[in-house]
Amino acid sequence: MLAGYFYGFYTGQNSYIRDYLYISWILWAYLVSEEQRKAQEDVAVENKDNHTIYDQLEGKDCQVITFNYTSYASQTSPTALYFHGSLKEYVDVENKNDFLHDDLTTIDLEDFFKNQLAAEISFDPDHKSIPIPSFLPPLKLRPVISKHYIDTWYHASQMVLRASKIIILGYSFSSADNYFCDMLRENHDAQIIIIDKNMETASRNVCRCLQLEANRYTKQIKDGHEIRKYNNRVTIIGADLLDVNLDDV
C-alpha cells in the first residue's frame, strides 16, 4: 500500500502524498506503541528465561545491518545500520532535512501529532514541508529521500564486502531488495549462514538472490534442525530464531 502512494512524490499528486502521509504516520504510531508496550512488559518481567536474538547480539564483537524499523538493533549495537530506515528518524522530503526522536519509549504520541507534526506539515506552494517517517516502502527502485540513505547504503556495502562471515537472521530476500543481493554477490569469499524457520521458501529465495542452483545442496540434520549447504560456503539452517544460540553458529 505504501509503495502505491509513494509514487505521488514522483508525480507531484498532492492527493497521493496526503494519503501516504496519513498511512505512513499511522503505521509509525502503531509500531512505536508496540515498542512502548514491550518496554513496559520487559520492566515487569525482571528475569526472562527466553532471550531474543537482540539480547544475544548485545556485547558481541560484530557489525549489524537491520531491515527492521524498530529501535531494538540500535539498543543492542549503537553502530547498527538501518537499511530501510528507522522509527527513530523522520525526514522532510521536500527540503531534505533529517530529524531524530530522542526516545521512542517516552514519546507522547498524541502530543507529538497535535503539537509538533501538525505544525511541521505544509502544502503551501511558497513554503512546502512534507515530513514523513524515515522508513522506505518495498520498492525495487531505491528512492533517495535523504543523503542519510546514501551514506547508510555505502557503509552497508563496505561492511558486507569486507566481511569474512555473514549471518542472516529471518530475512526474506525479497525481490525488492535486489540492491542488497548485489552486495552479497560481490563478496565471493565470506561464509554465509542463513537462519530461517521456513526452509523451502528461504532456500528458493536465497538461491535466486545468490544465483545458486536450487537443487545442488548437501542435507544434514543437527539438533533436530535441517541444514542445507550450497557451494561449500552458503549454509541454510531451518530453525526458529528463538531456538538459535548464536554462540554455536
Locations of the language-model features?
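Extended, H/D-rich, highly charged conserved domains that either
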Residues: 1-140, 144
